[in-house]
Amino acid sequence: MILFSPKEIKDIEELVKEREGSVEEIEVIKLNETPNISQFLVFIKTSEVPHYHAEHDLTFTVLKGKGELYLEGEKKKLKEGDWAFIPKGAVHFYRNTSELSVLLAIFSPSYDGKDSVRVEL
């Protein structure tokens, strides 16, 4: 699987192979960014903490592995090829249930990590 953009072509499978053995908890790699959108590879070996994004919508697909998405009090099992949409303000977290989950995450507008607000459940 490749990711083609005006700046470069990235081999996503190769990026995953390079990183999968060294991930301890969660690792994030920025793939592309404009003022309107940003794309990340997210490696999750454990679990995210419950949080929401005050100013960003998030769409992600599971490229590898499987896990559970907790979204606004609902739990849904996800596997490779599944997609999720998380609107801004929605409390959520992903919990890996395999050796490693790899997600392709797309934020709109572009995400800088500053609006991730942790919550207690």
Swiss-Prot record:
Disulfide bonding pattern of the chain: none
InterPro entries: Cupin_2 (IPR013096), Flavonoid_dioxygenase-like (IPR052538), RmlC-like_jellyroll (IPR014710), RmlC_Cupin_sf (IPR011051)
Superkingdom per UniProt: Bacteria
Cupin type-2 domain mapped to chain residues: 47-101
Protein name (database record): Uncharacterized protein aq_1978
Species, as recorded: Aquifex aeolicus (strain VF5)
